[in-house]
């Protein structure tokens, strides 16, 4: 390798560093100033890049934040599947408790809420929000409930898509409306109530 080649910057590595800095900045800033006051200029300043760098990769602050949340949800060490210990009720409680903790963490809650609110007024963003952030989780719950059916712990005729909505709907409603704390006790109560409805018929 020549001296010239050795000193040539690795453009792809540098671009990825800039990308990660931008995504981190968007997550941090939305928690500090809120989504309405979040700007591309502020993200660029925090990330140490020019705003044109951001506009080359993303058309809007919502697009930046969507990528940031997607990366956080699918990054290293993230397992999108639900545990299967053989006890579907215990497994659902474990996961919903962890979800309650995550949704109570300001570092996660602020950007995710910002996207949820923005998506309510933007059909294209809503579709991407559903496909990239919600559907993988919903599918994981569906797979775990299907395994519960196969194990005889859940009614074999249960509509699994509807069952997941019944389980998660009250949780999401409480979070979105800030109508109560997302405690482990609340998560357990939801699972217990749902499992009574999901149980095999005598």
Regions found by a protein language model. Give the residues of each.
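Tryptophan-centric aromatic hotspots in well-structured domains and transmembrane helices
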Residues: 57-58, 129, 168, 172-173
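Basic, helix-initiating cap at the start of DNA-binding domains
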Residues: 1-46, 57, 63
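Alpha-helical DNA-contacting segments of helix-turn-helix folds
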Residues: 63-72
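C-terminal peripheral helix-coil segments that are non-catalytic and often amphipathic
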Residues: 1-9, 90, 94, 135, ...
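Hydrophobic alpha-helical connector segments
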Residues: 78-109
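Base-recognition residues in the alpha-helical recognition helix of bacterial helix-turn-helix
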Residues: 52-59, 67
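Amphipathic alpha-helical segments used for helix-helix packing
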Residues: 69, 103-128
